[in-house]
Amino acid sequence: MTINEIIELVDHLKPNQFESDIKIKWLSTLDRKAYMEVMQTHEHCHVKCFKGYTNDDVDKELLIPEPFADDIYSAYLMAQIDRENGEMNKYNQSITRYNSAYLEWCNQYNRRHRPLPVRTQFVL
């Protein structure tokens, strides 16, 4: 799923006043978290380095693949929209949906990828 596809989907499902550059920033934050907390800690990570997205990256594929991408990215963007609008009840529902989808992806990733070995160092 590309950045543009998820932004168009969320704008269709939840019309809002936020510009694409704000949503791209939110997606960068989410993918940076996924990269640092999950992907980078396992062997065979298909991403060597993640620096975030810019407005020129709208056709770029997001890091989390289907079938998880749709639920994770849409729920996350909707939660950010709700939070910024001060709609806390809606935010709680959206962030709960996001947390559930993100945890499901994390568990699947952990099952399919071996964690990197941890080097033990002794300090004298």
Language-model features: where?
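Short helix-capping/linker segments at secondary-structure and domain boundaries
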Residues: I81-Y91
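Conserved short "hinge" loops at termini or chain/domain junctions
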Residues: M1-L62, L103-L124
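Short secondary-structure subsegments characteristic of cysteine-rich extracellular domains
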Residues: N92-C106
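Elongated alpha-helical scaffolds
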Residues: P67-Y76, Q80
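Generic detector of ordered secondary-structure context
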Residues: I22, A69-D70, K90
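Short loop/turn segments at secondary-structure transitions that flank enzyme active sites
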Residues: M1-I3, Q80-R83
